[in-house]
Regions:
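Cytoplasmic-side transmembrane-helix entry/capping segments in multi-pass membrane proteins
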Residues: 40, 59-70, 93-96
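Membrane-interface helix caps and helix-loop-helix hairpins in membrane proteins
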Residues: 28-33, 55-58, 81-91
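Interfacial helix-loop-helix junctions of multi-pass membrane proteins
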Residues: 81-92, 138-224
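Membrane-interfacial alpha-helical segments at the cytosolic side of multi-pass membrane proteins
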Residues: 98-115, 153-159, 219-233
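N-terminal membrane topogenic signal
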Residues: 1-16
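Membrane-interface helix-boundary motifs at transmembrane edges
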Residues: 3-4, 52-63, 119-124
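Short, highly charged, low-complexity non-transmembrane loops/tails of multi-pass membrane proteins
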Residues: 238-259
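Alpha-helical transmembrane segments of multi-pass membrane proteins
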Residues: 46-50, 71-76, 133, 137-144, ...
Length: 260
């Protein structure tokens, strides 16, 4: 039953799984065992949607499930192993936008399922449901930035990507120490310990990347929160497009492991 009802998402799952296994084999022979470990982690993450559906009896629409699968593949295999983060400057931005959308979908689903449960005395209006969905997504985004910052500080990673800027403003440059920002414009060269970095500008160490990530996470969260608000307020009134992105509880009489 599950595969028959989710033909498109199952096909995507199979294709992505085959690609990940192929990459894992290739990286194994190349001696890149860190990439092999990342492939194994990706294979486990690709199982997450199916695990949620079977374990918690939640019906994930095929469209949402495909987005989750593609997101995992794009982030881990394309982004990390294939270096798409470096090849395509917008790659990180696109993924953080998707993350905001997906996190909002998760937050919305959790509360909406409680709203509709007969065993829980809990009910929120469509507006508050959308607000909770938005706040959940933004919290996930902020916690992720905390994680990136911690990895950079404790282990010397560069998860908060750097950016080259050509102007800065800082009160630390104020010779009078009067808390007045001093502006430096048209920066084309920066030297560290007497050595030119050759960047053509000033190196910003993560602030711009962090703020861009949170801004696009905000956009993704707003988009799904609006979708969720419209869906709940007009539930059952022909909103078939929106329903493709909103999880719902499975019926109790269904065999969750049947293939036909």
């Amino acid at each position: 039953m599950e595969i028959r009802e989710h033909k498109s998402s199952f096909a995507v799952y199979v294709v992505l799984r085959v690609l990940v296994i192929a990459v894992a084999v290739l990286e194994f022979f190349n001696g890149d065992y860190e990439a092999v470990f990342l492939c194994i982690l990706t294979l486990l993450l690709l199982l997450a949607p199916a695990f949620v559906q079977v374990r918690f009896r939640i019906e994930l629409p095929s469209a949402l499930e495909v987005i989750v699968l593609v997101f995992v593949f794009a982030a881990e295999i394309l982004g990390e192993i294939s270096s798409f983060y470096e090849i395509f400057p917008f790659w990180d931005t696109v993924l953080h936008t998707m993350n905001g959308f997906l996190a909002a979908a998760i937050g919305f689903s959790l509360v909406d399922l409680l709203n509709r449960s007969d065993r829980v005395k809990f009910e929120l209006s469509p507006l508050y449901l959308a607000i909770v969905s938005f706040c959940f997504s933004m919290t996930i985004g902020v916690v992720w930035e905390f994680f990136e910052f911690s990895m950079d500080m404790m282990f010397g990673f560069d998860m908060q990507k750097d950016a080259v800027v050509h102007s800065i403003s800082s009160v630390m440059l104020d010779p009078a120490h009067a808390n007045h920002a001093v502006h430096i414009n048209d920066i084309t060269q920066v030297a560290v310990n007497g050595r030119d970095l050759g960047l053509g500008g000033y190196l910003d160490i993560g602030l711009i990347d962090t703020m861009e990530d949170l801004i696009v996470n905000f956009i993704g969260a707003v988009v799904f929160s609006v979708i969720g608000f419209i869906y709940v307020r007009n539930r059952g009134k022909g909103l078939s497009v929106i329903s493709r992105f909103v999880p719902r509880r499975k019926s109790h009489d269904r065999d969750y492991l049947r293939l036909w």
